[in-house]
Regions:
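Alpha-helical transmembrane segments
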Residues: 2-25
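Extracytoplasmic/periplasmic
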Residues: 12, 38-58
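Membrane-interface junction motifs in transport/secretion proteins
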Residues: 18-41
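Mid-to-C-terminal secondary-structure elements
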Residues: 49-198
Length: 198
């Protein structure tokens, strides 16, 4: 019993002292409706607007999944537009759908570029064709992190412009390696996250 207690204590200390690459303090996650209905995007927008008006809410965002739970999906067939290498289309990327406030709410820092513009997220990723990637994805695409990646294009059936590169963070757990991730802007969501004032 004593050995198990000491081991658990050390694991908790490690987790508390380790850098996740994001800030989870004072965050509250609200799961939205699991069934999509007509006009759901408008309802989501109204709910987010109501959240932002509450005095105890410092920041808020919406996403189709949340850190610790998972990604939206994984896919292959995405390559750098200029000079793709043989086999690049077989590399897998995790896809995560979120709004423009996700990175600020979770304290995820940008290495380059910026988040989505509000009207870009409202028009949805498949119409705007702008993406944000993490450092791991940038490296897997073959980009040099010391060079400017903003404005570069990737191909996923159609060309998508990279508008931001976020620093890597532990999206799932410490045990799992950080996955190459592409972030897509949208306003169709299943989760709302608020940072509350303590």
């Amino acid at each position: 019993f004593i050995i198990a207690t000491i081991t658990l204590y050390k694991q908790l200390q490690y987790m508390q002292n380790s850098n996740l690459g994001m800030n989870l303090n004072q965050l509250l996650v609200i799961q939205g409706p699991t069934v999509s209905s007509e006009g759901q995007a408008e309802k989501n927008f109204a709910f987010k607007n109501t959240l932002s008006q509450l005095a105890f809410v410092k920041k808020q965002c919406a996403s189709n999944n949340v850190p610790g739970v998972g990604y939206n999906f994984s896919t292959e067939g995405i390559t750098k537009m200029n000079n793709p290498q043989k086999g690049d289309d077989k590399k897998s990327y995790s896809m995560f759908i979120c709004d423009q406030n996700f990175f600020d709410t979770y304290g995820i820092n940008f290495a380059q570029g910026k988040t989505f513009e509000p009207n870009d997220a409202e028009r949805s990723w498949n119409n705007v064709r702008k993406v944000i990637i993490n450092e791991k994805a940038a490296q897997q695409f073959g980009f040099d992190l010391k060079q400017n990646i903003i404005g570069q294009k990737i191909t996923w059936g159609e060309p998508f412009e990279i508008i931001g590169v976020v620093k890597d963070y532990h999206h799932l757990s410490f045990r799992e390696q950080i996955k190459p991730t592409i972030y897509l802007g949208s306003v169709s969501f299943g989760y709302f996250t608020v940072q509350v004032d303590s």
